[in-house]
Amino acid sequence: MLVHHVRVNNIFDGVIPYTREWLLTKNFYIENKKILDKQRLGGYCIWKPYIILTAFESIQEGDVVVYMDCGDIPSTKLRKNVYDHMSRHDQYLIQQHPHNKNKHFTKRDCFYYMNCDEEKYWDAVQLEGGFMAWKRTERNVQILSEYLKCCTDERIVTDIPNQSGLDNFDGYVSHRHDQSIITNLQVKYDLSKVDGWLDNTGAGAFIKWNALYHKDGVEYSNGSKNWDENGVLK
């Protein structure tokens, strides 16, 4: 549905669906089989930076790759929103609600083994991992490569108990895997981000989150509203 929606509405210049079947043909899968065969998020989403770097191979310097979870649906207005932002910045990363502190959704080992175990990382607002845009630049290739390296370290990305001997923070809920990693990297490199939690003025106005997830047979979308005929939320 996502691929068809993007193509029919010409939201972006092209769309490439990446599947589990595609992943199984890659050396990346063989090298990281232990993590990728875990059921949780199809292998803790460690394929995400790999997919973005793979897509970089088919575009020119300065072009933009947009990653989007297959369960989300973009408004037709998203193209302009992303284009306007990326004309001034090299990344489009979506910040969650300000109450979602990184330390409550990141296990301690993720901070420790990324050399990010300090207050500015703990208290950062966590990013949304289901949508992001990256301009192909040499710096972004380096950052995404670091993202990928961290994602392939089971101490950092998986739910195994902390190996560092450090405890999780008070108020810890659960680990958010690749999302925790990209949040640490955003703070480390001061990457560009936008508000996503404001329905009408933030990125949340242009994306229907988890639109294809079903609960009790009924489609729902994390409370998102419907769009009007102009492609924006009512």
Residue ranges of each PLM-predicted region?
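Glycosyltransferase catalytic domains, chiefly GT-A lineage
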Residues: 1-234
